[in-house]
């Protein structure tokens, strides 16, 4: 097993069998030193399972979670790991435009199922996603058997609000007030629709932009990121 940068966690790549029979996809597995804990699926941004996503997984492993980060672009190209240069942004949007959302949620369900079967997992599993993964976290709450879902600056949630009536788990959404990918009108629509459901919380961070929780990112906003993290951890521990 590979040691990552944290002495208190271990990590390696594993394979997950897709339930539609189309093959296997990779996932980054990070475990706490104890090897035991609740499960957490990290749903990627549009840049693939890159260094940022793996670092987030390692961080939550340090917090005591067994974490899986599935390669959700595998049906287009396995192993996508992009940076944040203009060229990488262009490639990322191409993958995003070619992404099948329904199959992505199916892959997340397969990841949840796999995670529950990993030795040391308590059986409780959450989904936490960013950007593209933020919407997938919301859809996971609507369509999968996850125990809690947390979405950071999800894109397009306002177009899937009818599915909210199917949510049976805890859901927390973190919205960046300055996010051009989720403008004010969309934010209001989300708050109005989801605000009437118990156990569904929508938080708007007025001074934050898209990707405000990505450390070292252009739009990283520490006060908002810390507050969102505290709320996320609280929801995961309920």
Locations of the language-model features?
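N-terminal cap/leader regions of alpha/beta-hydrolase-fold enzymes
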Residues: 1-238
């Amino acid at each position: 097993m590979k040691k990552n940068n944290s002495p208190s966690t271990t990590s390696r790549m594993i394979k997950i069998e897709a339930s539609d029979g189309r093959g296997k996809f990779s996932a980054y597995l990070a475990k706490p030193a104890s090897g035991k804990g609740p499960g957490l699926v990290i749903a990627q941004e549009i840049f693939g399972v890159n260094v940022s996503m793996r670092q987030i997984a390692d961080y939550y492993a340090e917090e005591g979670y067994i974490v899986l980060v599935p390669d959700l672009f595998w049906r287009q190209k396995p192993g996508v790991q992009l940076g944040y240069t203009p060229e990488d942004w262009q490639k990322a949007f191409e993958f995003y435009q070619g992404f099948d959302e329904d199959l992505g949620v199916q892959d997340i369900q397969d990841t949840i199922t796999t995670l529950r079967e990993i030795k040391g997992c308590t059986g409780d599993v959450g989904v936490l996603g960013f950007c593209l993964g933020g919407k997938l976290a919301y859809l996971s709450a609507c369509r999968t058997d996850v125990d809690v879902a947390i979405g950071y600056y999800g894109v397009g949630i306002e177009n899937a609000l009818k599915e909210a009536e199917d949510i049976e788990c805890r859901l927390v959404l973190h919205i960046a007030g300055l996010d051009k990918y989720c403008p004010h009108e969309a934010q209001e629509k989300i708050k109005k629709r989801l605000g009437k459901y118990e156990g569904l919380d929508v938080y708007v961070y007025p001074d934050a932009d898209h990707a405000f929780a990505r450390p070292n990112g252009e739009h990283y906003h520490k006060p908002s990121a810390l507050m969102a993290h505290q709320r996320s951890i609280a929801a995961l521990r309920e």
